[in-house]
A protein has these predicted regions:
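Macromolecular interaction modules
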Residues: 2-235
Length: 235
């Protein structure tokens, strides 16, 4: 299913120009934040993550193709109903920051082959704005994090694009609303390195800022395309 769907689910569609796939082995799942949230009620669920980039200003066309295509794949029996489908959502990339000015840019991130990835989700606190949260990350959290060995090389942050009403029934309708943001932190090292010093504390830092509420933080690693590597390490 993973080998088929990585391409047939999105990558062959219009406007989609990059994709990458990540896995969470048990050692990484054990590092996930465990607070109750609307994304992952069970912290041990969700072993694979596929991420795709598509061209800006093509959301309606691309989303329409995705819905019709996945419904077709369902009809062909190619959606592997036995899996746990934990979270699918579209995000509009609003900003990004890279550690090195001449380093990898966000449009090339999924082709770069970063060995580690951390997903960070949060909600803007009542009375505050996405712009304030962006400024806090850019001015406070990221400069410090990017100076540390555990820190990211590149970060992209997006806001929610609502799913189509006729999206497949097995796609979980997350409670995420307009205050939700989701960030992808790309690492040039194992995402478990320095976890307790670094990403284990990002939720508390977000809450302490008064600008955002922490939803979920989770580390991932690259899959090895064309193999079943890591399937024996998921639980």
């Amino acid at each position: 299913y993973e080998h088929d769907h990585f391409f047939s689910g999105c990558l062959v569609g219009p406007n989609v120009f990059a994709g990458d796939r990540f896995v969470a082995t048990r050692r990484l799942k054990d590092l996930r934040s465990t607070d109750t949230n609307d994304m992952t009620p069970d912290p041990l669920r969700g072993s694979y993550l596929a991420v795709y980039w598509w061209l800006e200003n093509t959301d309606e066309e691309t989303n329409r193709w995705n819905v019709e295509n996945v419904n077709k794949l369902h009809a062909q029996g190619r959606m592997y109903a036995e899996r746990d489908h934990v979270h699918t959502l579209l995000y509009d990339m609003k900003w990004n920051v890279q550690r090195e000015p001449t380093g990898c840019t966000i449009d090339l991130a999924l082709d770069h082959g970063y060995p580690g990835l951390v997903v960070v989700a949060g909600d803007v606190a009542e009375g505050h704005t996405h712009a304030e949260v962006e400024a806090w990350f850019k001015d406070t959290w990221l400069p410090d994090a990017m100076s540390k060995p555990w820190g990211p090389e590149l970060v992209g942050s997006g806001t929610v694009i609502p799913l189509a009403d006729d999206a497949p029934a097995d796609v979980v309708r997350a409670a995420a609303g307009p205050n939700r943001f989701l960030q992808l932190h790309f690492l040039d090292h194992d995402s478990a390195e320095g976890w307790e010093e670094g990403y284990a504390r990002i939720g508390a830092a977000m809450e302490a800022s008064g600008l955002a509420h922490h939803v979920w933080t989770a580390p991932w690693q690259q899959t090895n395309f064309g193999t079943d590597d890591y399937t024996d390490q998921l639980r």
